């Protein structure tokens, strides 16, 4: 468990273009697709299409557009967000990549409005915009869960939007491959009546 600590004074960068994002995502997409073929997994066959990286890029790019209390129009988070420090067992460290977390399961704590959601979005974007993307981020907003759409359903729906066909073999491959990161945002926004069930799903 880590606490959201503070932000540094780094200069914000210009939003990355969809074309550049697709280009940067391509090596990881190709790697995962080839790995799935070697394991005989058929659920990612649509990833072979030359247009697929752009589709993934569009999904990731959507995480970059956010609304703030300062502007009436949506902004690119890259235009204003500064990487934070997280408190790793009493030691504050700057974090910009998912690879900074040694554990596979991490909980980030912070007060309301401190920027945890924006931080998770930035981690997803930075993973792809780095020159050595290791994992494809799967971003889930827990506030959208209902008694009819549980966490598993939300995950499956997001995977389907990535042109992944849902079957037991494919799901097993995805979460054993080490090439996907599940980012769950908004624990404090889960409907009270489904909190327990959601926590059990996570465990």
Per-region residue spans from a language model:
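P-loop NTPase signaling cores
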Residues: 4-10, 15-48, 52-71, 75-203
């Amino acid at each position: 468990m880590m606490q959201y600590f503070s932000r540094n004074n780094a200069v914000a960068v210009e939003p990355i273009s969809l074309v550049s994002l697709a280009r940067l995502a391509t090596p990881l997409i190709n790697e995962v697709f080839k790995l799935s073929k070697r394991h005989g997994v058929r659920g990612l066959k649509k990833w072979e299409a030359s247009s697929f990286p752009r589709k993934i890029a569009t999904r990731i790019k959507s995480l970059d557009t956010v609304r703030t209390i300062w502007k009436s129009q949506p902004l690119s988070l890259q235009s204003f967000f500064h990487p934070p420090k997280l408190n790793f067992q009493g030691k504050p460290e700057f974090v910009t990549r998912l690879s900074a977390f040694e554990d596979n399961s991490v909980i980030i704590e912070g007060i309301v409005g401190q920027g945890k959601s924006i931080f998770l979005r930035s981690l997803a974007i930075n993973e792809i915009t780095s020159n050595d993307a290791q994992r494809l981020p799967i971003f889930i907003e827990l506030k959208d869960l209902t008694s009819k759409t549980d966490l598993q359903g939300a995950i499956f729906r997001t995977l389907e939007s990535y042109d992944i066909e849902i079957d037991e073999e494919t799901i097993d491959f995805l979460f054993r491959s080490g090439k996907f990161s599940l980012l769950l945002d908004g624990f404090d926004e889960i409907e009270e009546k489904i909190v327990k069930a959601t926590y059990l799903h996570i465990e």
